C-alpha cells in the first residue's frame, strides 16, 4: 500500500482495503481535489488511515455482502473521514447482492447518489 503512480497532473495512490490480498482502495488527486474510492472492503479500523489524505469526496461500497461493508459500517467510515461529498457505490449490481443507496445518502452530510450515464463535476 502507499504505492503512487503519477500520470500527467493526476496522482493515484493505493490505500488499504480489507478484501483479498490483491485488493486496494484508491486515492485520486487531480485539479486540487482528492477523491477516495474504497473498492471492495470489509470494515476495518485501518480504513481510518484515509484521514491523512483529507479527501473532498468518498465513494464507498455499501452492499454488505461478499467481502464488503454494509451501510452502517460505510456510514461509520465516511463520517469519520469527514469528506464534503459522500457517494455510495457497489449496489444494484446483482439482485441478490444489493442495497438501497438512500440508506447511505440520506444519513450523512453531503450524501449524493450518482445517476447512471451522467457526468459530474466537483
Feature names for model-found ranges:
Residues 1-52, 66, 115-122:
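Core dinuclear metal-dependent hydrolase active-site scaffold
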Residues 1-2, 49, 73-122:
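Binuclear metal-ion centers of metallo-dependent hydrolases, dominated by the metallo-beta-lactamase
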Residues 9, 18, 40, 56, ...:
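Acidic-enriched, low-complexity/disordered segments with a strong bias for Aspartate over Glutamate
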Residues 28-84, 89-95:
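Metallo-beta-lactamase
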